């Protein structure tokens, strides 16, 4: 057994004792009832299970939860898809996903949404040139698998959020 303490979507959890072999995906879904994080491939290849990990230095990245033990997240601060909206108010990225019909079955949506959010946060700190935007989005979403082939729609949704707030996310033209 492992004693686990962590923060999820701004709320502290723990100490809670979990089996050493319990995956983070199972912890979220079975222990906490947070079913937005999906179990896709079970090999960290499709990234439908990706959550956001917030480091103390202010950087964030996504991490798969299907192969990672819950214990490996001890002491960490993470965000799941359930943590994006504030009450009934969706984020700009969530609204863009809906407007673009970026999901069909929705299985991969949480991973794409989390990756898109990390990209937005990164660009807010280090904007890119407009000419580099398409490649920047493609690189960020690379590795996420959509069984329904919604890649273009996810890409377009992320791009629209960035362009709608270009002063925040894009470098000033030289």
Segments the model singles out, each with a brief description of its role:
Residues 1-174:
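Signature of N-terminal electron-transfer/Fe-S-associated modules in redox systems
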């Amino acid at each position: 057994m492992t004693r686990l303490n962590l923060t999820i979507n701004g709320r502290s959890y723990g100490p809670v004792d979990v089996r050493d072999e319990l995956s983070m995906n199972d912890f979220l879904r079975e222990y906490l009832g947070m079913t937005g994080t999906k179990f896709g491939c079970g090999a960290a290849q499709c990234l439908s299970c990706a959550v956001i990990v917030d480091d103390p230095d202010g950087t964030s990245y996504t991490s798969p939860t299907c192969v990672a033990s819950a214990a490996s997240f001890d002491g960490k601060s993470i965000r799941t898809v359930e943590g994006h909206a504030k009450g009934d108010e969706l984020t700009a990225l969530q609204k863009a996903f809906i407007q673009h019909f970026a999901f069909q079955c929705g299985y991969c949506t949480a991973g794409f949404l989390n990756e898109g959010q990390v990209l937005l946060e990164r660009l807010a700190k280090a904007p890119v040139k407009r000419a580099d935007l398409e490649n920047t989005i493609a690189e960020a979403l690379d590795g996420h698998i959509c069984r329904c082939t919604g890649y273009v729609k996810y890409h377009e949704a992320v791009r629209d959020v960035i362009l709608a707030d270009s002063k925040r996310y894009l470098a000033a033209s030289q």
